[in-house]
């Protein structure tokens, strides 16, 4: 579908979308969202309940799927991580924005996560090297203290510096009219990332700071905002999330559909948000999704061995999935 039509044409031509059981229809939380961002959310809503949009993290792994399975995933997952100032200071370089623009040129969907290196206080030891700097154990940065500095503290200003650095990259995408599924501050309740290390309150405050800085200060509106928790204590709220997601890494060979998490997230969102799997190891079996009525809108396989080792997702299974008429790929023509 995306190989044939632009996002804007999808917004205005529901007939081109093929069969669809539209179960949810709501506008973007950002009332100033660009036409492209509105079209992207609308497209996902139109597929929700009848199709499952395929995704693959990392351009190398995306290319692997296209080469070895013969079908290209609809969504490319990329990471803003090496645009973080702390990473740049250690020589980090990134071509993520270039990858995103290229994928948009294929009429693909782009999803961006941000493994945010702590703004300062990376331990940078043999045990905890700088490149682990988004992990709680690898930094002494305290998010609770930073967000409660009331705009005057050094660490608060460093948070803004980092957000500004990512906003500069989002602006490049905005100028290219590229909408993105933006999933910042992911997996907060795990506590293994510094933004979730001090509990829900500072995490939620940081979410608000980030959203305000990007949309109001930088006037950027080309994002569909993706939250990433099924824990009600950590969920920012439907007024702050366009799509609600989980990350799901079951045992090797388990292609179940995480029905318990789906139901939990339905409750958390009051059945008012599209639900998706922002990261997976083994892909949920589309037959099981349909049979159990667990309608994750999309799934994004993590990179490297998760897609390439032949164990997490055996090639025979991948061929089955990508040739299923319910699975949306880049060259999907509709069921």
Curated annotation (Swiss-Prot):
PROSITE patterns: GH26
Alphabetized GO MF terms: mannan endo-1,4-beta-mannosidase activity
Localization in the cell: Secreted
Keyword Plastid carried by entry: no
InterPro entries with a match to the protein in the record: GH26_dom, Glyco_hydro_26, Glycoside_hydrolase_SF, Rhodanese-like_dom
pH dependence: Optimum pH is 5.0.
Secretion signal span: 1-18
Binding positions for substrate per the UniProt entry: 192, 249
Record function comment: Endo-1,4-mannanase, a crucial enzyme for depolymerization of seed galactomannans and wood galactoglucomannans.
Similarity section: Belongs to the glycosyl hydrolase 26 family.
Name of the protein in question: Mannan endo-1,4-beta-mannosidase man26A
The organism of origin for this protein: Aspergillus niger (strain ATCC MYA-4892 / CBS 513.88 / FGSC A1513)
